[in-house]
Amino acid sequence: MKRKSVTSRDVAQLAGVSQSAVSRSFSPASSVSEKTRKKVMEAARTLGYRPNTIARSLITRSSRTIAVVTYSLQNPFYASLLEKASRFLQQQGYHLLLFFAPQNGDFDMLVDDLIRSQVEGVLMLAITLNQHQAAEVADFGIPVVIINRTVEYSGISQVGSDNFQGGYWAGRYLASLGRQRIAYLAGIPESTTNRQREEGFKAGLAAEGQTCFAYDEGYYRYDDACDAARRLFSTRTMETLPDALFAANDLMAIAVMETLRDELHLSVPEYVSVIGFDDMAMSAWPSHSLTTLQQPIDQMIIKATELLLTHISNPDALPEQLVLPVTPRIRRSTTEGVLLK
């Protein structure tokens, strides 16, 4: 015999509340007392009631769904951003859909997927995405907020960290250690994030009377950074080896340290001091103990999601560009020196 489906009216009768109170109790962002919510949830568990979120979205014309677009999760920093964004949005009563930016550059296909999915807003975590792609999504009336990079387009809200100041600190700090041959390992050269970190780094060196000794590119990827380390360190004499390196992110910095240690038998920091950028969790592991610039990841996520929800509720809200400070985290990958402000 087919079991009769349980409705919100059944739950309301058992809990002794109105149907609208039942509906509000299943919407985390709705106003309802904790006492009422508890009564509704107990009644729902007793009856085996499950709200029909699809039907609700058709009635309210609200999917309560946010898309997160990223290029890859191989970098643990972006995996951490994704986790924190998901938890925060769930607390606000939203669901999260994950999209990966196509490697073949066919961004139109991604835009079509976002529109078909009827998402209410988009968080872009991909450092490879540019302002034209973000604007393409926004042109369809979908609110967009970019995290961890700034783009030269004022029509979209952006939340990033102070890349220039972080690079500036790295350049001055390495020079303060007495290092004379300081290299830079770039991420994606044309990205604004990389340009800001590189420009800050070179300005910091200049403040100490130095210039960048050597340069290579690791594209923010582990394997490419290993290849770059081999080019930078395996074809030189000891007198012409870089004695310090600033990498544009932690993943590349760790790749350099492991290549130096395991393949080239150059110890860190005795031969080479290394600094990264991000302060992802594994950077603090004893096997790495990487000096780095910590991005305020919790604050970035809170600010970005709050901005996105503001744009969803008020499409006329003006876009904001927020730049948050970074914090040096000095560990064993650099020798002791003077902590510069």
Give residue spans per PLM region.
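Glycine-rich phosphate-binding loop signature in dinucleotide/nucleotide-binding domains
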Residues: 47, 117-118, 177-178, 232-241, ...
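Periplasmic-binding protein-like
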Residues: 119-126, 183-185, 215-216, 237-249, ...
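Hinge/beta->alpha junction and helix N-cap segments in small-molecule ligand-binding domains
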Residues: 70-80, 98-107, 149, 159-169, ...
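Flexible loop/turn connectors
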Residues: 234-341
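Short beta-strand segments enriched in small/hydrophobic residues
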Residues: 14, 19-24, 58-74, 84, ...
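N-terminal helix-turn-helix DNA-binding module of bacterial transcription factors
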Residues: 1-63
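Alpha-helical recognition/docking segments in bacterial nutrient-uptake
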Residues: 1-3, 61-172, 176, 234
